[in-house]
Amino acid sequence: MSLFAGRPIKRLSLLARGGVGLAVAEFLASRRGLEVVSYQATDLAPRLRRLFPRAKAVKDPTTAAYAAHLRRDADCVFSAHCAVVLPPRVLDATPHPINLHPGYLPWGRGYWPTYWAIADRSPAGCTLHRMVALVDKGEIIARKRVPVLPTDDGQTLTARVAKAEAVLVREMWADLASGRYPTFRPREKGTYHDRAEGLSARRLKGSTRMTARQFTDLARAFTDTRFDGMSVDGVYLRLSLHEAKK
């Protein structure tokens, strides 16, 4: 464990998406002494415009122009479910490149960490970490474990992890804002899954060989009413999970 010591975070650029991104944005809007100077123009753009009327909307946070904006105007770039991998020129433009990740790092690096926590039977949770060029490999600031219940599917676990993410940001904000916060590198190897692996795992062939437990874990991991879920030979399925009556 070490202490990262940089200048206080008084001006912040927010890259936020989805429900967790909105929760983070609303929390940051309530912080005295913090100015959100820009935000990514994602699905949240109309709401972020109302929360931060003086901030500029950024279409592409990978450009040299955005990096120059950060060097000039921001102490921190804060990512909350941003779907873009930021290049080194952006990560190096502020002393505090911070990401909120819906996985208990080093497990769940990459795409769909809550789903893979079920499929892999690996730890689930959320993590605040410093961003580096390698995806989800930066030093960990703080993390919060979320138990995987026997009746969880991908959607229910994702919802509980989202609540934990909002709590983690609130708990750690005073340290982050001061510019002085603990960091550490995990000793465990953890897991990584890219997008292609997730898409492939959701499209099984009838000839695929696996145990009943592996099939059940994979099916419930990708059970989520927000998309089609897992399929076998083109037939989609979702599991309905409940504990046995005693």
Identify what each model region corresponds to:
Residues 1-246:
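One-carbon transfer enzymes
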